[in-house]
Regions:
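Conserved functional hotspots at enzyme active or ligand-binding sites that engage polyanionic ligands
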Residues: 1-45, 49-138
């Protein structure tokens, strides 16, 4: 499910801990459904923002990452309600490619859908992502 219910600014706090469990500030690999056909999707890196307040402690919410560059088509993406932010490189991409995070589509992660931890996002960048998400609302 991909909606904004279930996460608040208070719940989103930087707390990575490489322990096999997703934590805010970590990038994990998880199954993400396609928007146009939620019955299909693919494994992709997801930045964990917070525990999912709806899941009774057994899920998380996050934002998907991509190595595709949306800077060149940012106006078109924004017209379609898609907003991206550069987050740099990290251990989540084995080829070391720069990544972008999609700010406007919150992804719900269930424990069974998380495949593995990928890396930890820099704390400064994590807080910049949160600020950019808040900026979409106003």
């Amino acid at each position: 499910m991909t909606d904004d219910a279930g996460v608040t600014d208070a719940a989103a706090h930087y707390a990575p801990e490489i322990d096999g469990e997703p934590d805010p500030g970590e990038v994990v690999w998880a199954w993400v459904p396609y928007e146009d056909d939620p019955s299909q999707g693919k494994d992709r890196p997801v930045l964990v923002l917070a525990p999912d307040e709806r899941s009774a402690g057994d899920g998380w919410v996050g934002l998907m990452l991509t190595s595709q560059d949306h800077d060149r088509d940012a106006e078109d993406e924004a017209r379609h309600g898609r907003h991206w932010m550069d987050v740099g490189t990290g251990g989540w991409d084995s080829q070391g490619r720069p990544s972008e995070v999609r700010l406007d589509r919150l992804v719900r992660l269930e424990r069974a859908g998380v495949r593995r931890e990928g890396a930890v996002l820099d704390e400064r960048v994590f807080h910049e992502v949160l600020a950019a998400r808040r900026g979409l609302d106003g």
